């Protein structure tokens, strides 16, 4: 099922999504951008930066409403980032507001994070892996499986907190329970559909979905009652959404000190740089927390208010967590063993690779015969002309995406018109300075193109009609004008262009 939907009619050939896609998982076909699911890692960057809003996220909201209306037992797994992204006085108000929407219960995903944290601590204690990469971020997992499969042995063989929590809830409340994850991540939607654990999460909503639904029902979170979360102590694992949150959680629960160096990386380009460094064998003996979103989950692609400071959110979350009371020992539930193991595998996209001769042939079609013809301007979305030529061969890109080539092509066409048109064509600016002058003008006005381009219109004909068009923004069509000094009768069309040259 599609995660991101493209509205073709809104796509305006700006190629901004192609430029910003770190893995170039967007193809352009018939001038319109399309996502290639096999190549996409669902970082959501294209969703954030599209200036035309041509990309929208497919929502599960109507499906969730149908579940509740059908009388299903529907439980929320609430990502801890809610503490920085929703407005409330106490966290219990959030639980109350969601239950008023019809959910049977609302639980925090940090419960599942506690199980994952324990597994990470075991891996660190065992010390058998050369490097350990956290596997909480499904976008990072997809990046490694698709583009750096050499690093799969470094991926912690552990499910994400969302999957762990889904299994926990269904174990406690029955297999027929519907679990809805609520968070800021779009890659979670694909993770929920993954055949490796497709029975754990039944739907995924983001906070925009929740806010829209609350508004529809006239529910204000700050006005709701404080209904505490009856669960195990999740406090330290609520830090997962912020940078270094996973590391902080693991360190806080370790029984004995391990020998791994620990650091975190966030942001698409930084994650790719690290992966390339690890492929080269430059990193060893490290536990690495990786998150594709710059700033962590609290800066996920569905967080529309980009002005939100991740630093302020982190401080707010830590303050909120510190105010939460430690649950009594007897409130901590005893769980049967929840399966947390996950197997990762190579999902490398198999794109055809052109020969050097084929690359040169494609480059030649856009006027790039010699290496110095390759401007590498990046306007098409690809960093080099060569990479763009490879994309053309792979049917990901089109020849006319090369803006310098299309400019030269249009200029050549314009020159051809100016040289061969049987009509006199003049282009002037608002000062009546001639910018273009067709070759046939010499026959009628006695001025060569070279001479005319050094002159103002009023130096050889009356510019009154041209000035009127500039002043009124009204065009003139089919006006008969006689020039006695040139013994010339004309039928004139004067058209205003608002393009500034």
Which residue ranges define each predicted feature?
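Terminal or standalone catalytic/regulatory effector modules within metabolic enzymes
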Residues: 343, 354-406
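Terminal output helix/cap of sensory domains in signal transduction proteins
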Residues: 450-491
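Iron-sulfur cluster-binding cysteine motifs and their immediate structural context
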Residues: 3-6, 12-36, 41, 45-61, ...
């Amino acid at each position: 099922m599609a995660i991101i939907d493209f509205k073709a009619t809104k796509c305006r050939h700006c190629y901004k999504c192609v430029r910003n896609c770190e893995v170039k998982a967007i193809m352009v076909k018939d001038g319109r951008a399309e996502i290639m699911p096999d190549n996409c890692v669902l970082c959501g960057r294209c969703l954030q930066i599209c200036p035309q809003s041509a990309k929208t996220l497919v929502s599960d909201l109507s499906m969730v409403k149908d579940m509740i209306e059908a009388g299903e037992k529907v439980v929320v797994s609430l990502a801890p980032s809610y503490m920085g992204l929703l407005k409330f006085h106490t966290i219990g108000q959030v639980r109350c507001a969601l239950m008023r929407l019809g959910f049977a219960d609302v639980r925090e995903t940090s419960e599942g994070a506690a199980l994952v944290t324990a597994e990470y601590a075991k891996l660190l204690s065992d010390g058998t892996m050369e490097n350990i990469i956290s596997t909480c971020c499904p976008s990072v997992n997809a990046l490694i499986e698709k583009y750096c499969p050499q690093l799969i042995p470094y991926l912690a063989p552990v499910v994400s907190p969302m999957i762990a929590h889904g299994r926990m809830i269904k174990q406690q409340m029955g297999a027929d329970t519907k679990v809805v994850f609520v968070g800021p991540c779009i890659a979670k939607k694909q993770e929920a559909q993954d055949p490796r654990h497709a029975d754990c999460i039944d739907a995924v909503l983001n906070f925009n979905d929740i806010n829209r639904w609350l508004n529809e029902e006239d529910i204000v979170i700050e006005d709701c009652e404080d209904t505490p979360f009856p669960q195990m102590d999740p406090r330290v694992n609520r830090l997962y959404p912020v940078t270094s949150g996973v590391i902080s959680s693991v360190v806080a629960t370790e029984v004995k000190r391990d020998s791994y160096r620990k650091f975190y990386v966030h942001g698409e380009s930084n994650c790719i740089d690290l992966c390339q460094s690890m492929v080269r064998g430059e990193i060893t003996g490290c536990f690495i927390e990786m998150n594709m979103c710059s700033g962590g989950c609290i800066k996920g692609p569905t967080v529309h208010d980009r002005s939100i400071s991740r630093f302020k959110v982190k401080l707010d979350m830590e303050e909120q967590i510190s105010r939460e009371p430690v649950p009594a020992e007897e409130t901590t539930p005893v769980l049967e063993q929840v399966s947390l193991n996950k197997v990762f595998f190579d999902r490398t996209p198999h794109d055809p690779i052109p020969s050097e001769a084929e690359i040169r042939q494609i480059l030649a079609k856009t006027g790039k015969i010699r290496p110095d013809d390759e401007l590498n301007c990046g306007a098409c979305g690809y960093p080099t002309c060569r990479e763009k030529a490879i994309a053309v061969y792979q049917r990901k890109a089109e020849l006319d995406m090369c803006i310098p080539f299309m400019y030269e092509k249009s200029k050549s066409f314009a020159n051809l018109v100016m040289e061969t048109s049987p009509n006199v064509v003049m282009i002037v600016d608002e000062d009546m300075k001639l910018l273009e002058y067709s070759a046939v003008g010499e026959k009628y006005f006695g001025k060569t193109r070279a001479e005319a381009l050094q002159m103002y219109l009023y130096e050889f004909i009356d510019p009154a009609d041209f000035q009127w068009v500039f002043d009124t923004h009204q065009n003139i069509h089919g006006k008969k004008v006689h020039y006695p000094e040139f013994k010339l009768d004309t039928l004139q069309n004067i058209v205003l262009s608002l393009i500034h040259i």
